[in-house]
Amino acid sequence: MGCVKSKKSAAEAAVGGAPGEKARLVGPEEARAPGAPQAGPVLLDYAQRLSEEIVVRAVQQWAELDRRYGDIPYIECDAP
């Protein structure tokens, strides 16, 4: 295996996007379409429990992989 160089230019990597592209955060009021139904408390509770379960599984998977492959040294790329 070898090093993988980024396909972005240094300027794009520093900015984090394409030239002329602007990022902005969207609030919950702006993201909701007019007339769209609101999520009820049951749905919000389900979504919260599901997201917590996903995070727990991801951490368990990371811990297992770290335990299994943690002794393999990381080799950084020295290529220009």
From Swiss-Prot:
Compartments, as annotated in UniProt: Cell membrane
Coiled-coil segments on the chain, per record: none
Keywords tagged on the record: Cell membrane, Lipoprotein, Membrane, Myristate, Palmitate
Major place of residence: membrane
One CC-aspect GO term: plasma membrane
Entries under Pfam families matching the protein: SmAKAP (PF15127)
Lipidation (N-myristoyl glycine): 2
Functional note: Binds to type I regulatory subunits of protein kinase A and may anchor/target them to the plasma membrane.
PANTHER family reported for this sequence: SMALL MEMBRANE A-KINASE ANCHOR PROTEIN
Protein name in UniProt: Small membrane A-kinase anchor protein
Organism: Tetraodon nigroviridis (Spotted green pufferfish)
